[in-house]
């Protein structure tokens, strides 16, 4: 049975100031997008020209200015500089104000954001970061019941805690995964799953999607009920040279996960990224000036079973991208099946 295809837009918080980013999200809804997602960084990946608006303030502002788009984080780390109980409160409040439109996308975190906000000591290994994430999700979901919560976990604790304003529709939690371990957990416990494009066909076909299915089956859940989101890095423009050059600002995406997770300053991230040649930077992106070529490359991801495509455009003229997307790409994409 074919599943509904959703088209979303990634609001580039590392690239635009808060007000401009709100206006871009409003434009995304006007141009037909089904969702808008925002990253949650305390520090951007670039020191020069970078931005880092607070995701929760942005989400509330976008909620007031829009009517139908889903609004969420892609992604937030609710485990170090944030107390997950407070994050639960924030998302419950937004869920009350914008019913059925708020989602919480979560990940295990990067050192860049946490050290700057006061984290001390050696950056935790993946095992601890993943354990913190699972525990944080359990705590938040308990709080969203509205019942008294006395939570005594390994990392987080509450005492006689109540969530007094709880939305009628539960807040869906989307789990970001770059490998099969977390992807299995997303299938087991997530309302949604998030991954990013441009990392090699076998990752999606042989590791991530099969792991989500495996997790869902073991938990006796319906795989089709899990919203499977992918951030698609796309630099589409009728001008081929502009399509290529637009990727330069986002060179940090082409660093290895090991480099990104351990770097603890924006200046160092920028230095490493700017050493990369434009050809290597562009490899993470679908760079296209022909709409049929662009859609054919996107089709790979729907063929893998991903049903919620969130498009991240690298250029500084986001309205130009949205106009071209609505005119050239959306009609073709809407014909794809999952």
From Swiss-Prot:
Pfam family of the protein (one): Bac_luciferase
Molecular function GO terms recorded: coenzyme F420 binding; glucose-6-phosphate dehydrogenase (coenzyme F420) activity; oxidoreductase activity, acting on paired donors, with incorporation or reduction of molecular oxygen
Record's keyword annotation contains Manganese: no
Catalysed reactions, as listed in the record: oxidized coenzyme F420-(gamma-L-Glu)(n) + D-glucose 6-phosphate + H(+) = 6-phospho-D-glucono-1,5-lactone + reduced coenzyme F420-(gamma-L-Glu)(n)
Binding positions (substrate): 196, 199, 260, 284
Example of a GO biological process term: carbohydrate metabolic process
Residues the entry annotates as binding coenzyme F420-(gamma-Glu)n: 40, 77, 108-109, 113, 178-179, 181-182
Top class in the EC scheme: oxidoreductase
Family: Belongs to the F420-dependent glucose-6-phosphate dehydrogenase family.
Stated role: Catalyzes the coenzyme F420-dependent oxidation of glucose 6-phosphate (G6P) to 6-phosphogluconolactone.
Quaternary assembly: Homodimer.
NCBIfam families in the cross-refs: F420_G6P_DH, F420_G6P_family
Official protein name in the record: F420-dependent glucose-6-phosphate dehydrogenase
Species of the source: Gordonia bronchialis (strain ATCC 25592 / DSM 43247 / BCRC 13721 / JCM 3198 / KCTC 3076 / NBRC 16047 / NCTC 10667)
């Amino acid at each position: 049975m074919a599943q509904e295809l959703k088209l979303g837009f990634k609001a580039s918080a590392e690239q635009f100031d808060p007000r401009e980013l709100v206006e871009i999200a409003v434009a995304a809804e006007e141009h037909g997008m089904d969702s808008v997602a925002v990253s949650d960084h305390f520090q951007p990946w670039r020191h020069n020209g970078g931005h880092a608006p607070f995701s929760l303030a942005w989400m509330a502002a976008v909620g007031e200015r829009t009517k139908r788009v889903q609004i969420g984080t892609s992604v937030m780390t609710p485990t170090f500089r944030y107390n997950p109980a407070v994050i639960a409160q924030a998302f419950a409040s937004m869920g009350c104000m914008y019913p059925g439109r708020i989602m919480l996308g979560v990940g295990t975190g990067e050192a860049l954001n946490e050290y700057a906000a006061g984290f001390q000591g050696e950056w935790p290994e993946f095992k601890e970061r993943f354990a913190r994430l699972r525990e944080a999700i359990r705590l938040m979901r308990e709080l969203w019941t509205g019942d008294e919560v006395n939570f005594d976990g390994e990392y987080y604790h509450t005492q006689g805690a109540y969530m007094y304003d709880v939305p009628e529709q539960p807040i869906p939690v989307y789990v970001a995964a770059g490998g099969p371990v977390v992807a299995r957990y997303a299938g087991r416990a997530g309302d949604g799953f998030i991954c990013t494009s441009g990392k090699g066909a076998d990752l999606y076909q042989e590791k991530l999607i099969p792991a989500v299915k495996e997790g869902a089956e073991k938990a006796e859940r319906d795989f089709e009920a899990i919203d499977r989101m992918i951030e698609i890095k796309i630099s589409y423009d009728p001008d081929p040279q502009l399509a290529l050059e637009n990727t330069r600002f986002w060179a940090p995406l082409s660093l290895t996960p090991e480099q990104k997770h351990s770097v603890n300053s924006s200046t160092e991230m920028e230095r490493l990224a700017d050493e990369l040649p434009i050809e290597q930077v562009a490899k993470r992106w679908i760079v296209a000036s022909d709409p049929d070529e662009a859609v054919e490359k996107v089709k790979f991801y729907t063929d893998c079973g991903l049903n919620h495509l969130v498009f991240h455009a690298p250029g500084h003229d986001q309205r130009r991208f949205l106009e071209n997307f609505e005119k050239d790409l959306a009609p073709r994409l809407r014909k794809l099946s999952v």
